[in-house]
Amino acid sequence: YFPDLPDNKGLEGITVNTVNQHVFVVKESQPGLLIELDAECRTILSSRCLSKANGFSHPKVGPDKLDFSGLSYDPRSDSLWIVSDQGRCLFQYDWVQDVVLQRLDLEIGEGKRRLVRKAEGVAIDPECGRVYVVSDRDARLYVFKLAAVG
């Protein structure tokens, strides 16, 4: 899953499951990969390919172009929020069931809507139902209010 340099399709994001302290990292693409490590980051416990088979798809982005650039653990729903730069969207993913629960396009602006460009990081505040997404291209932090988390 990790071809020789100068591939630049390596690990992009990291988060911690606050219930069991397991660490998750996401590989950007070719293939997109989610890796679960023990709390000490010494042992790979499991890994999953992120593909159309488990719901990682976007109607405007081909499967070979969809990438993953950040992730955040949500303890309320025991799920992971994974952001895609190329998809300009956010996936809520259930690790146990190995399925995407929902895909949210990262729309911003008043009036004419546009999408966040080059989304590279995500953090969730489950208490407030907010998701924070950082744009590398615009050097901005966007805040999204979720109608229902989980």
Model-derived features with residue positions:
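Sequence/structural signature of beta-propeller domains
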Residues: 1-150
